[in-house]
Swiss-Prot record:
Belongs to the endoribonuclease YbeY family. Its cofactor is Zn(2+). GO terms for cellular component: cytoplasm. It comes from Serratia proteamaculans (strain 568). This is Endoribonuclease YbeY.
Length: 157
């Protein structure tokens, strides 16, 4: 039986209306057990200022972003179930959901799925990597009961 441990940190000025811990747990459990038996992830929900600062510091981009992934790297010879941290910006997620005409809950779920796959080593820099990652995201989102998160982007009206 797999075990997923979540450390949820709420660092927004207004934490009302955010998905609850059980919902974040369900999303993680929809992703991680497919890849490893045990996993521990911190999800920190932040405002634009913190997202912007972290994005500038670690990616050189002076703007807030939807999700940042910080994989944990254990010292050689030490095995821990700690995968890493996801930093998710509330305002960016809410704005993107509205702009893309997506259900807010589904977009939150997508950010957790997307970020978790980054923690597991997936990326989307090269086209073939992006295709593999998007395919996994779509499959996982369907398993969680959500539509293809890329459908609207792939098939504009």
């Amino acid at each position: 039986m797999s075990q997923v441990i979540l450390d949820l940190q709420l660092a927004c000025a207004d934490n009302s209306g955010l998905p609850d811990e059980a919902t974040f747990q369900r999303w993680l459990e929809g992703v991680l057990p497919q890849f490893q038996e045990e996993a521990e992830v911190t999800i920190r929900l932040v405002d634009e200022a913190e997202s912007n600062e972290l994005n500038l510091t670690y990616r050189g981009m002076d703007k807030p972003t939807n999700v940042l992934s910080f994989p944990f790297e254990a010292p050689p010879g030490i095995e821990l179930p700690l995968l890493g941290d996801l930093i998710i910006c509330r305002q960016v997620v809410e704005r993107e959901a509205a702009e893309q005409d997506k259900a807010l809950e589904a977009h939150w779920a997508h950010m957790v799925v997307h970020g978790s796959l980054h923690l597991l080593g997936y990326d989307h820099i090269e086209d073939d990597e992006a295709e593999e990652m998007e395919s996994l995201e779509t499959e996982i989102m369907h398993g969680l009961g959500y539509p293809d998160p890329y459908l609207a982007e792939k098939d504009p009206l």
